[in-house]
Design a protein with these regions (language model features):
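A short, surface-exposed interaction/processing loop segment used at functional sites
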Residues: 208-242, 249, 336-341, 345-367, ...
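Preferential activation on post-signal-peptide N-terminal prodomains/segments
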Residues: 23-328
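C-terminal soluble interaction/assembly domains
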Residues: 413-423, 429-451
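Bacterial N-terminal signal peptides
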Residues: 9-17
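Short, small-residue-biased leader/transition segments that mark boundaries at the very start
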Residues: 1-6
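Segments that shape or occlude catalytic/ligand-binding pockets
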Residues: 258-420, 428-432
């Protein structure tokens, strides 16, 4: 089976010394960097571009060599660089959740005066089961009214199962205690929510989720006449027939929603983040036949990324990049810390947080960076060599997304240590309906910017 982690794949890394990193293979493309280097020392904001000779825009060709390509071009009208005047290498370690952290998050999110309880998936309380029975009973009534015999049969069967479970269910939930559990129930305002924590003893897996409880009862949180189910999601992925001119009924503005989300993350001990995406929150209502009966905008969905000295690291989905090796012994992987928050008129109602890393406090400040002149020289020497060995279905490549940013890489010399390092990204996003989705490039190379 092809071993490739598609979620946030790592492509080519061309650097002044080594270049390509897969989890199980390493291929070197020597870049001599025979020109002079610039020191990215302290200075005024914006001095980084001046010191390294980085233009605001660039259009030019890269040699094709023996790659078989007809052309390799760079064409970007707005080259992106950090607003700071220097860059660093910052060390992080793989994150895990101890009991104290879970307690901190639960007490920050839930109303402590109403109690915080352990949720046991295998031993639910009578109130847990009754909530589910109530939800399925409502679905059953809708199914009967609409003549949906299939849904009616399913609801009857599942309600019967839940009623049988009631026989051995406990009357009361168990308190959170020492917070050694992984799932907790608590109140936000008048509604119950669940917080679920997960991490991994090996690799990177620390994450927690906040969701309405029970999830199938979300229609009780936001009822609508004739609707049995409701789902809330990013309006960008709504059907084409959704009326985009609908007003957003959220009592918060978009900026206020972003601030609420940042306050939520800060209360969970997550401060070094930067907003990377915001969209309207679309609520879609369905009847028992899963036909849409209504839609509305109420709130916003926001994604934050790790902030590295005020810069959001590169985290595009590179699954469309066909020059990645498909060898069985190569696994491309990278670390993408994302924090997605939903806010409606009641505040934060859903969160999916991946604080995969924790800072170690170690930082190499003011690292020396490759000049733009040396970078172009390195590209002309090594990009043809890369495409000679790693074939693509494209005949012509045009990098239209050029940026100097940070990228997270594993420090192979230390156990469980990761580094955010300065890199150049040269990526190509194809045009679709007059727009370019730079989060899903079709070509990409990465150049370590260190001398």
């Amino acid at each position: 089976q092809r071993q490739m982690c598609i979620r946030d794949s790592l492509v080519t890394a061309l650097s002044a010394a080594t270049v390509f990193s897969g989890c199980n293979k390493k291929v070197d493309y020597d870049v001599d960097g025979d020109g002079s280097s610039e020191n990215s020392g302290s200075g005024d904001s914006g001095a980084l571009a001046s010191r390294l000779g980085i233009p605001e825009s660039y259009e030019g060709d890269i040699e094709v060599g023996d790659s078989g390509l007809k052309s390799i071009k760079i064409k970007d009208d707005d080259i992106s660089i950090p607003s700071s005047d220097s860059m660093s290498i910052i060390n992080y370690k793989s994150n895990t959740f101890d009991n104290a952290y879970k307690q901190k998050v639960c007490e920050a999110v839930f109303d402590k005066s109403k109690g915080i309880y352990v949720y046991d998936w295998e031993h639910q309380t009578k109130s847990d089961l009754q909530s589910q029975i109530d939800s399925f009973q409502a679905m059953l009534e809708e199914a009967k009214a609409s003549g949906d015999t299939e849904t009616e049969s399913y609801c009857n069967e599942y309600i019967s199962y839940l009623e049988d479970e009631m026989t051995n269910a406990t009357d009361e939930r168990t308190g959170a205690g020492d917070y050694s559990a992984t799932d907790f129930i608590g109140n936000i305002g008048d509604y119950e929510y669940m917080l679920s924590f997960s991490d991994s003893e090996e690799g990177l897996g620390a994450n927690f989720e906040l969701s309405y409880y029970p999830s199938e009862g979300l229609i009780n949180y936001k009822p609508h006449e004739g609707a049995t189910y409701v789902y809330a999601y990013d309006a960008q992925y709504g059907d084409e027939d959704v009326d985009e001119s609908m007003p957003n009924s959220c009592t918060f503005t978009q900026d206020e929603a972003v601030s609420l989300a940042q306050e939520f993350l800060s209360s969970c001990g997550i401060d070094d983040v930067i907003p990377t995406y915001t969209s309207q929150l679309l609520w879609e209502y369905y009847d028992t036949s899963y036909d849409v009966v209504a839609t509305e905008y109420d709130g916003y969905i926001m994604t934050f990324g790790r902030s590295v000295n005020g810069t959001a690291p590169y985290s595009a989905d590179l699954s469309m990049v066909d020059s990645l090796s498909s060898d069985d012994d190569v696994w491309y992987d990278s670390t993408s810390e994302t924090f997605t928050i939903q806010v409606d008129s009641n505040g934060v109602i859903n969160a999916s947080c991946y604080p995969l890393l924790a800072p170690t406090g170690d930082e190499q400040k003011n690292v020396e960076l490759m000049s733009w002149k040396d970078l172009l020289s390195a590209l002309n020497k090594n990009v043809p060599a890369y495409y000679t060995e790693n074939k693509t279905s494209y005949n012509d490549i045009e990098y239209n997304d050029v940026r100097l940013t940070y990228y997270c890489m594993k420090d192979e010399s230390q156990e469980n240590i990761y580094q955010y390092v300065p890199v150049w990204i040269f990526a190509q996003a194809d045009e679709e309906d007059g727009t370019y989705d730079y989060d899903y490039p079709v070509q990409a190379i990465m150049v370590l910017s260190l001398i």
